[in-house]
From Swiss-Prot:
Pathway: Secondary metabolite biosynthesis; Alkaloid biosynthesis; Mycotoxin biosynthesis. It catalyses: [(1'E)-5'-(3',3'-dimethyloxiran-2'-yl)-3'-hydroxy-3'-methylpent-1'-en-1'-yl]-quinolinone B = yaequinolone C. Gene3D superfamilies: Isochorismatase-like. Belongs to the isochorismatase family. It comes from Penicillium thymicola. Keywords: Hydrolase. Disulfide bonds: none annotated. GO terms for molecular function: hydrolase activity. The lineage of its organism: Eukaryota, Fungi, Dikarya, Ascomycota, Pezizomycotina. Its EC number is 3.-.-.-. The gene is penJ. Epoxide hydrolase; part of the gene cluster that mediates the biosynthesis of penigequinolones, potent insecticidal alkaloids that contain a highly modified 10-carbon prenyl group. The first stage is catalyzed by the nonribosomal peptide synthetase penN that condenses anthranilic acid and O-methyl-L-tyrosine to produce 4'-methoxycyclopeptin. 4'-methoxycyclopeptin is then converted to 4'-methoxydehydrocyclopeptin by the ketoglutarate-dependent dioxygenase penM through dehydrogenation to form a double bond between C-alpha and C-beta of the O-methyltyrosine side chain. The active site is at residues 30, 106, 141. This is Epoxide hydrolase penJ. SUPFAM superfamilies: Isochorismatase-like hydrolases.
Amino acid sequence: MSSTAQSFREIVGIPRSSASTQDSTLIIIDAQNEYATGALKVENVTETRKSIAKLLERYRQAGNGKNIVHVVHKVPEGAAVFTPNTPLAQEFEELTPNTGEKVVTKNFPSSFAKTDLHTYLQGLGDVGKKVVLVGYMAHVCVSTTTRAAAELGYDVLVVGDAVGDRDIPGVKVETLVSVVLSELADGFATVVSEEDIRA
């Protein structure tokens, strides 16, 4: 049953945002093979990676790649997930970065934690002030990055059909993703669909 409650953002007068490939930066979070074939495989990976690939192609057609950021998670040698020097650590092959696209390596859930992402976005000028987030997992790295971006003053959009997750103890994935997106929409971001991001 859906709620008719007003969001916090509505109550304080923050309007919904929108984005195009010309006025925003696409940030692809942890779209790595771990989430397709590893221990952390997400339930909706086929659908979400298609949405991510569509957005990436749209941004590529619109510019020079500077407003495209690939964030990849790195772990110590021998780790059970994202294992270095194995396919699990690699980004989905259809998302392989082109020349001019930024790659950020992170070690924490937030894409901003101990990385140069904030500095890079500031250097882009206006196009770096609005960020469009996609990737995995909704309740960890996507959520944490969204909140950090909002705290840093970015206009944040999360593409709901381009983020994924898995069942966690006590919560099925459908409920988990729905709650995460509702939380983010309430206080930190505008949640949109892939088709809402205009060329």
